[in-house]
Amino acid sequence: MGSLDSNYDTESPASVGQFNPLDPEEFRKQAHCIVDFIADYYKNIESYPVLSQVDPGYRHSRLGKNAPYRSEPFESILKDVQKDIIPGMTHWMSPNFFAHFPATVSSAAFVGEMLCTCFNSVGFNWLASPAATELEMVVIDWLANMLKLPKSFMFSGTGGGVLQGTTSEAILCTLIAASPMHFEIVGVKTSTSFVVYGSDQTHSTYAKACKLAGILPCNIRSIPTTADSNFSVSPLLLRRAIEADKAAGMVPLYICATVGTTSTTAIDPLSSLADVANDYGVWFHVDAAYAGSACICPEFRHYLDGIERADSLSLSPHKWLLSYLDCCCLWVKSPSLLVKALSTDPEYLKNQPSESKSVVDYKDWQVGTGRRFKALRLWFVMRSYGVANLQSHIRTDVQMAKMFEGFVKSDPRFEILVPRVFSLVCFRLNPISGSDPTGTEALNRKLLDWVNSTGRVYMTHTKVGGIYMLRFAVGATLTEKRHVSSAWKLIKEGADVLLKED
């Protein structure tokens, strides 16, 4: 795959006139081949090991050391994808992928992504692509309505939203927006006195975003959680931490709550945390990256109760709303704070619509300047499937997780460790109640390795409250009940093998 010849400058380049990187007819031909390739990939995806079986550094023997000097046939490149790339893939689209929260796919999002790539607009301001900007505003409000968010978060009200890449970016932007507010209101001279708060279950992206925002690592507070509260954060402990910091002369800046933590889908009490945030004048952000999508279903909406008192909310449709990575919605009540903190105004971007302040320039709502036309994906998904089908998709995943939970409960050798809320089941093999915790952990590590080594299923683990547990996350677009049943049979088979060895 690729040429090993590194003497690029010893040959004359091909005639410039022969090179056309965007020939419409050649594109049509190649695109047909790619669509067939992709359709066959999805059709045959169950034949691949879910977890890649290659060793680190496998590229050295397969992918070549240098880029080819001469062009290579499209057909040869596609063959190399099959031969060299797919073996190195962990197949997130596999119906037997039960590891991390999913990155969902759909035909509608795929078509939207194709158009996004086709237009290749760089929509940093309204004038650069009016359709990209205004369609994004539309789908942001559509999803807000689906979630029954208050008007204070919507363009049709007093707020607004933006499509970020990931939760990390969303949190980073709101942290940056919160800082100037405190510089002015509290009169802080330096960010070294800022303190931010989350729990020991808050996603690691929060700590990363805090560091990027200039928050000292020693000023990132992680409030401990316990099984008694199903690992949701305690407002009382949070209040005590803030009081201690204020007494030490520190300045509380930001609270990050979570609806659906990664380890166990714990749900923080938003209304009670909003009381704390209000009492101390700190920015209150809610991370609902995974579980927030479920709140388009009326039976799950109560998990967002209290969101009307938050300053910002982030949610990732690429996790559960069939919209492909990357797609993270960020809503803010005060867009002006975001714009003030992130805006740039170089002469070469000045234009009448921007100067009039009558349009949204999304470059001022994000870290970067350039941005893709990602709203097309969400627009196609929402229009192609409608709210009813998206709700059905989520409910089906939850029902399959409930089915798996029932399997676990029916086998006395296993136990459920935290209550299932959405489509994640946390469990472990514990054949002898009260057995040595170290031995139980070792047994479950072996079970996880045994299951994943088969290539037939891929799961992950977590450790919460000192307990090692297995995570079974249902959500891949192609997953059906038969895949869940087969996964359980494989897990039981692994347990049989390991317990016989003991």
UniProtKB/Swiss-Prot annotation:
Annotated EC: 4.1.1.105
Pfam families attached to this UniProt entry: Pyridoxal_deC (PF00282)
Catalyzed reaction equations: L-tryptophan + H(+) = tryptamine + CO2
Needed cofactors: pyridoxal 5'-phosphate
Key words, A-Z: Decarboxylase, Lyase, Pyridoxal phosphate
Enzyme class: lyase
Gene3D superfamilies tied to this protein: Aspartate Aminotransferase, domain 1, dopa decarboxylase, N-terminal domain, Type I PLP-dependent aspartate aminotransferase-like (Major domain)
Record region (Disordered): 1-21
A molecular-function term among this protein's GO annotations: L-tryptophan decarboxylase activity
One Gene Ontology cellular component: cytoplasm
N6-(pyridoxal phosphate)lysine modifications at: 319
Record's function text: Involved in the biosynthesis of tryptamine. Supplies tryptamine for the indole moiety of camptothecin (CPT), an anti-cancer monoterpene alkaloid. Represents a key step in monoterpene indole alkaloid biosynthesis. Is specific for tryptophan, and inactive against tyrosine, phenylalanine and 3,4-dihydroxyphenylalanine (dopa).
Name of the featured protein: Tryptophan decarboxylase TDC1
Lineage, top ranks: Eukaryota, Viridiplantae, Streptophyta, Embryophyta, Tracheophyta
